[in-house]
Amino acid sequence: MAGKPKLHYTRGRGKMESIRWLLAAAGVEFEEEFIEKKEDLEKLRNDGSLLFQQVPMVEIDGMKMVQSRAILCYIAGKYNLYGKDLKERAWIDMYVEGTTDLMGMIMALPFQAADVKEKNIALITERATTRYFPVYEKALKDHGQDYLVGNKLSWADIHLLEAILMTEELKSDILSAFPLLQAFKGRMSNVPTIKKFLQPGSQRKPPLDEKSIANVRKIFSF
């Protein structure tokens, strides 16, 4: 029997958080080996564990996988969260890329100066409500199913819920004009594996605090 996947990253969300979400939603137990200091990262680089000298890195099925997109695609495919055919995969990819763009803007916020951060929060909420969420609201309406693609849970649904919860941390009523997304959030949050991941004490990570931000800067030298 193969061991549990092992995730190598800092204690923050970053690019590993979507991987944590996907594994948790698939009901897969995983271990984490945290990068606490610069020397931990250097050790991974020096022992040849990081193909491009970067994390996230996930040990799974005898591989040391890097590049978050590749890791996510592998997990989605392995655990039947990637559609039933090529066309469904294309839609899942498009929806995931949209939420990836939105979450990428949010992930950058803690490392920005206060004045820049304030402007970007306004930009993110505007983009979320005019560019991204209308697409997903329409997709749910047109598709007429509980899910974005097909008639079962997919990576696209999991990623969208993650994005919704991240944007709600910036503006709690951000879904006020999107009734189908509100209902979607309720449904997805009650999927047993996801519900478990959303409980206190899970491996889901909180937003970065000032101490964590300083440590991340030190580890990655920026």
UniProtKB/Swiss-Prot annotation:
Q: What is its EC number?
A: 2.5.1.18
Record carries keyword Cytoplasm: yes
A Gene Ontology cellular-component term: cytoplasm
Q: Where in the cell is it found?
A: Cytoplasm
User: Can you tell which superkingdom this protein's organism belongs to?
Assistant: Eukaryota
Record field: catalytic activity: RX + glutathione = an S-substituted glutathione + a halide anion + H(+)
GO terms classed as biological process: glutathione metabolic process; xenobiotic metabolic process
Segments forming domain GST C-terminal: 85-208
The record's SUPFAM superfamilies line, in alphabetical order, gives: GST C-terminal domain-like (SSF47616), Thioredoxin-like (SSF52833)
Which of UniProt's keywords are assigned here? Answer: Cytoplasm, Transferase
Provide the assembly information. Answer: Homodimer.
* Sequence similarity: Belongs to the GST superfamily. Alpha family.
Protein name (Swiss-Prot/TrEMBL): Glutathione S-transferase
The major lineage groups are: Eukaryota, Metazoa, Chordata, Craniata, Vertebrata
